[in-house]
Amino acid sequence: MRTYSPKPGDITRQWYVIDAQDVVLGRLATTAANILRGKHKPIYAPHVDAGDFVIIINADKVHLSGNKKTQKLAYRHSGYPGGLRSVRYDELLAKNPEKAVEKAIKGMIPKNTLGRQVLSKLKVYSGDQHPHAAQQPVPFEITQVAQ
């Protein structure tokens, strides 16, 4: 018997909604990255996008453990010499909390064409409302140890 290799037409996608309120950012990112890549499915293959859609709400209420809020820096580069910019995570969460969550998840996804396709299935919102009710998303509970 030959090994089964999933084809793009064989994959059924589901929508999950994750509430990020009081969830540690790293644990949220690993859970979302695994769902986006499809690693929770038995038909997972690294060369096929078998992942599901992920909606993250309450991104502004995400938790960073320890002193990371004041000490951890988020970097970006303009591409010009001397164009490295850094911002503390407490400033980033105050200004653009969606970007902080997207950046954490993006770091856990492969940096190639398939990774960009996987990231297009991620939707992050700072409030508790999202415009994807028509897709009937299923709530996904993140179980974690108390922080």
UniProtKB/Swiss-Prot annotation:
GO terms for molecular function: mRNA binding; structural constituent of ribosome. GO terms for biological process: negative regulation of translation; translation. Keywords: Ribonucleoprotein, Ribosomal protein. The keyword Protease does not apply. GO terms for cellular component: cytosolic large ribosomal subunit. InterPro entries: Ribosomal_uL13, Ribosomal_uL13_bac-type, Ribosomal_uL13_CS, Ribosomal_uL13_sf. Pfam families: Ribosomal_L13. Part of the 50S ribosomal subunit. This protein is one of the early assembly proteins of the 50S ribosomal subunit, although it is not seen to bind rRNA by itself. It is important during the early stages of 50S assembly. NCBIfam families: rplM_bact. PANTHER family: LARGE RIBOSOMAL SUBUNIT PROTEIN UL13M, RIBOSOMAL PROTEIN L13. Belongs to the universal ribosomal protein uL13 family. This is Large ribosomal subunit protein uL13. It comes from Streptomyces avermitilis (strain ATCC 31267 / DSM 46492 / JCM 5070 / NBRC 14893 / NCIMB 12804 / NRRL 8165 / MA-4680). The gene is rplM.
